[in-house]
Swiss-Prot record:
One of its GO terms (molecular function) is GTP binding. Residues 457-460 are annotated as: G3. GTP binds at residues 411-418, 457-461, 511-514. Residues 511-514 are annotated as: G4. It is found in: Cytoplasm. Residues 411-418 are annotated as: G1. Its main location: cytoplasm. This is Translation initiation factor IF-2. The keyword Cytoplasm applies. SUPFAM superfamilies: Initiation factor IF2/eIF5b, domain 3, P-loop containing nucleoside triphosphate hydrolases, Translation proteins. Residues 69-163 have a biased composition (Basic and acidic residues). Belongs to the TRAFAC class translation factor GTPase superfamily. Classic translation factor GTPase family. IF-2 subfamily. It comes from the Bacteria.
Amino acid sequence: MSNVRISEIANELGYPSKEIVEKAQELGLKVKTHSNAVSLEEAEAIYEYVQSGVIPEKFKKEKPKAKPKKEAKEPSEKEVGKKQTKAKEEKPAKASTTQKKDTKSHKIGETKAKKDQESVKKQKVEVQPKQEQTKQELQPKEAEFKSEVKDEISEPQKPKESLADVSQRRRGLMIVKKKKEFESAPVRRDENRVKSTDAVEINSLKNMFASSDENLARKKKKDKKPVVATKKDSAQKMDLLGSSDFGDIVIEDEDVVVLPDFSFKTPTPQPMQKTKQPNVLKPTINNTINPFGEGGIQRRARKKHKKPENKQNSEAVTSINIPKEIRVYEFAEKLNKQPSEIIGKLFMLGMMTTKNDFLDEDAIEILADEFNVEVNIIDDQKEFDYVAAYEEEVRDDENLLPRAPVITIMGHVDHGKTSLLDYIRKSRVAAGEAGGITQHVGAYMVNKNGKNITFIDTPGHEAFTAMRARGAGVTDIVIIVVAADDGVKPQTKEAVNHAKAAGVPIIIAINKMDKEAANPDLVKTGLAELDIMPTEWGGKYEFVPISAKTGMGIDDLLEIVLLQAEILELKANPKASAKASVIESSLQKGRGPVATIIVENGTLRVGDTVVAGVAYGKIRSLLDDQGRPLQEIKPGECGVIVGLSEIAEAGETLIGVKTDKEAREYAQKKAEYLRQKELSKSTKVSLDELSAKIAEGELKTLPVIVKADVGGSLEALKASLEKLANNEIKVDIIHSGVGGITQSDVALASASKDCVILGFNIRPTGEIKEKAKESGVEIKTYNVIYNLIDDVKALLGGLMSPIIREEQLGQAQVRQVINVPKIGAIAGCLVTEGTINRGAKIRLIRDGVVVYEGMVSSLKRFKDDVKEVAKGYECGVGIEGCNDIRENDYIESFKEIEEQAKL
């Protein structure tokens, strides 16, 4: 016979294991913890004892003091308790099956009708003493109850249950899936016991309470509420196969069903199952039991777990370390404050924030003063700062060898920078450039006297400021080219400022000396105003007159460059891992993302793993400036790398790392940081900016998609287009990218109203053109940045409100006012200047002040209608909607001309 654990009984009944252990100990069982096991018979006794509160007969003999204790608390029910106890101890002979069925069918109707009355009386029997009237009514019933029990109890081994047990039968019943191991003979014996006991219980109860006073029960129900203890059992687990209603039916279905029970039935204790059932035996105090089973089983409210109090709140925070980029809720956690406190402080200062917004340095400083906290800002980018990690790793000064100098050529547009480089390289790059101007950054290698020199050619157009700044940032020496016939121009001044900011030596090349209009002194004077003094004037800057066309002075220029490089003592460690700067990047068909780089330290080889910002990868191939393959690039040299995961941003630092995993982690952390930073910008708004954002919503926008051949040109285009804005219109760049125009670009443009695709140095394919035509999308491509900017300006001008310009037509003096019936006042005028035209707008001027502005309704000379009246002639003028005309007033005639606005 298998045993059942106390914990399983507790789970089945929905009671704590501790209470079940105590009940088992009250029955005299040797149980100490919930893990102890008892037999099925003992488990059945515990189950019955917990439900009814009455100790079974078998265990009552071992512990006889349990019942007298209950009787002592209920002195008013002494006689009834004795009768019931006596009835339970008797062992009458078994009644016949026919007698049980007849008794049950005869009594069941009346039993159901009195269920509520019996439930109330059961509660009163347990809770409060009965009055005299109750005793008198119950005494004859007790005698009858006793005789009925002696005659009809059919199961000698089954102890008689109390009135409380019987009232429990009205609860909802639960049919539980049976297990095969328990479908044995003991269950069948229980079925027979249920059948015999049902008839006894129903018959005896009917005789006991047939003539009870309903008014007394109703009165007592009003006097005192039912005790909560009687509500513990909201449902019973019963074996319907043992019910007399289903005695002849065999049910083999194992499904679990829940049904309401409207009859009195004695429960057959089921073997304990491990499956945890819903806790329906222990409802909360406020829950009520539905006697008709409507609405199913009531569920207890989930207990709310109390959050552990944060002990740190009581501790005063005096100093915190925070990253440079920190959100409001993160700052609140550092201070042991609620985010609402931080948001409230910022709101009082006029800043509207949410808990996910980043705090700037000013806000952090203000909050630190408000909360009296010392704030130390740390660099949170260290975890993905691969450049700093490289610098720490490569610190030794050993293995340093001279490297090639990096020279950047800068200057104003059309001053001959690329032509100078073409002569040095013996090439013709300038001839192949669109519009004759440089629009990309180029890096080239030149060998002079057995020494390599790396040249960087930068654009001179104003749109390429960022390109020039990048060129100056990675260079060792800057050559500023100035045309001798043009002098110092705006981009010349900008180039000087970039070079000074980079702290690099400057060499001035005075170009176009072969022209007759060349004036080198003009160049020297202009640069002297920028503190660039030539050596012959007592300064420290070399001025070299050259001609990129004839080659005059170019050898002298290269000699000065090499001499300056020797003075700088440029050295690097070729044995270290590579460190390089990305000068330009693009997307090439068949190669994918490519980048033009200049190696600053170490040696870059094919197969190296590198990371550059959010791009990483293993180098598949290296190319020189003429497209020839290389195996390695040494310090100070330039080249093109192939193999990055995506287009590297121009200006990024490229570092060689040991493993692909390390490179991927750096790139992903950097990408996540940039994404979070971008998201935070979109949520920030202050009170001062709120009105500006509302007004911005009223701006007219020109949506564009910008595609360019290289990243540097794309950056320059975006910067130039964003500048084309005023208080009425602006350019909205909805997408930009490097590479050709794709079908997704056309689809995006078609989804945006009036969107234009702008391509720079790229051409769409025939398929793309056809799809754009079908979608009604306009594609415009350019090779020169001037033309692109001018066209966008024209488009913006068409969207702007037209300019209204007035053109004066003439003036007339009112000599006499004539009142015409049904028409109004007519001004008799003499035209003193120009002409007065019918249909034109006029102003009525009195004493130099405009008193009315409207249209000419009629214009007559004598009796004839005329279109216009010239100077020196008299006429009659009717003004539409105006009768307040006086003598000596002036009438001024004009027309409005609309002109397209220009940006």
